[in-house]
From Swiss-Prot:
PANTHER family in alphabetical order: GLYCINE CLEAVAGE SYSTEM H PROTEIN, GLYCINE CLEAVAGE SYSTEM H-LIKE PROTEIN GCVH2
GO CC field: glycine cleavage complex; mitochondrion
Originating gene: gcvH2
Protein name: Glycine cleavage system H-like protein gcvH2
Gene Ontology annotations of biological process type: glycine decarboxylation via glycine cleavage system
Domain Lipoyl-binding residue range list: 44-126
Annotated family: Belongs to the GcvH family.
Organism expressing this protein natively: Dictyostelium discoideum (Social amoeba)
Coiled-coil features, chain-numbered ranges: none
Length: 150
């Protein structure tokens, strides 16, 4: 029964990948310790702090995020985290775009990034250059990067 379900699921997913592109379904990572998820239509990038980044920084005490509608170029600083292990840790745009939304909950509860970094995003960008997403690391490259970083 599981084999059949798995086979159906895999072929269904393979069909979706070929229509939309694999980028829409994978989490990618920046060298600035951020995770990035691209929407199904490749127009919105959701950005958060990676688990490794949260671990490395220690307890996050303060989050400064950009205002909505701000335009950022790839690798441009858009915010700051302050933590027990880093006085100020810069946040950099993994792709070029306009800030659509910021996670306001983080301003009141910055420790959410420590508690569940995978599900507590920081910023959503309207992507202006989708090809820049290819410059980010997939999970395998990120694992190697993290090993080197340690």
């Amino acid at each position: 029964m599981n084999i059949i379900k798995t086979g159906i699921k895999q072929s269904l997913v393979s069909g979706i990948y070929s229509k939309v592109g694999i980028r829409a379904f994978c989490t990618h990572y920046s060298a600035e310790l951020e995770w990035v998820k691209l929407s199904d239509d490749n127009k919105v990038a959701t950005v958060g702090l990676s688990s490794f980044g949260a671990q490395r920084l220690g307890k996050i005490n303060y989050v400064e995020l950009p205002k909505e509608h701000r335009k950022c170029r790839r690798e441009e600083k858009f915010g700051v985290l302050e933590s027990s292990n880093a006085t100020a840790f810069g946040l950099y745009a993994p792709v070029s775009g306009e800030v659509l939304e910021v996670n306001e909950k983080l301003k009141k509860s910055p420790s959410l990034l420590n508690e569940d970094p995978a599900n507590n995003w920081m910023v959503k960008f309207k992507v202006s250059k989708p090809d820049e997403f290819k410059k980010l690391m997939d999970s395998n490259k990120y694992k190697k990067f993290v090993q080197w970083y340690r």
